[in-house]
Amino acid sequence: MPEGHVIHRLARLLNDAFAGEPVSVSSPQGTFAQQAAQLDGHVLERAEAWGKHLFIHFAPGNGGASGTVGGAGAVLGPERIVHIHLGLIGTFRLQPADVPVTGQIRLLVSDGTTVAHLHGPQWCRLITEEERDAAVAKLGADPLRPTDPDNLATLDDVHARVARSKRSLGSLLMDQKLYAGVGNIYRAEVLFLLGISPDRAGVGASREDKEQIWELLTDLMAQGEASGRIDTVRPEHTPEAMGREPRKDDHGGEVYVYRRAGQPCLVCGTPIATAVVEGRNLFWCPTCQAE
């Protein structure tokens, strides 16, 4: 499942391509056709991400007739935000409009120069501003909204809830009601980099633990948003520095423990351990992260 940095990067790319412009909107697959027709020709105001959720806001003014951009059309009603969650297999990509797009396309957005195409999302809905606010209210603090006042208020609550919890940090970090946008890779890598056992309970975590987890999530996810991949290894542990083969994985990036079960730790040589926590395989070093 794409982690939050992917969704924030996607929101930025959508804004770069379409923000402030009228766009054509369609659903070649047909599942979202009725909603797409309402949006067709309207101005795409902005895209935003909160955790793993993407919200695309459209202006309430007149839209174009079907298949046009910028013509006169119906006024858009209160349902003018597209809410997307990619789930495990969804993809949303941008490319030049003159390059053919294939496959089952749930949503197609274009300005004639660039096209964005959505495939296989967990959901793609047309919602109101109130429904967007309600969805965000259910989410925890987002490391990629470090200066958002609402997010910082949520973070204070998250730290308090973690401090009272008997659940392990390996479990808590996957809870989207606490850490919005954090997924399996960042969970494993952050705990390793801080030398924290994934079995440590929230109630047993120090204030420093919680603050360091948040700060590292903020830094690493910002790097991931900028580069489009997850890299967590320090310079001294890169393939070039260690004379080892680069990691070969569909997720890309150089990491310490994620999907490295049984392989030697890049720091101490201990075989990386794995266990299922919150329905996903968690990875850690029993030596570097000893409790």
Set out the residue ranges of the language-model regions:
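Alpha-helical structural motif
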Residues: 3-6, 10, 19, 132-135, ...
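Gly/Gly-Pro- and Ser/Thr-rich, intrinsically disordered tail segments characteristic of DNA damage-repair
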Residues: 1-127
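Basic, nucleic-acid-binding surfaces and adjacent catalytic neighborhoods in DNA/RNA-processing proteins
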Residues: 22-35, 67, 161-291
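Phosphate/anion-contacting hairpin/loop surfaces
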Residues: 69-195, 201-204, 213
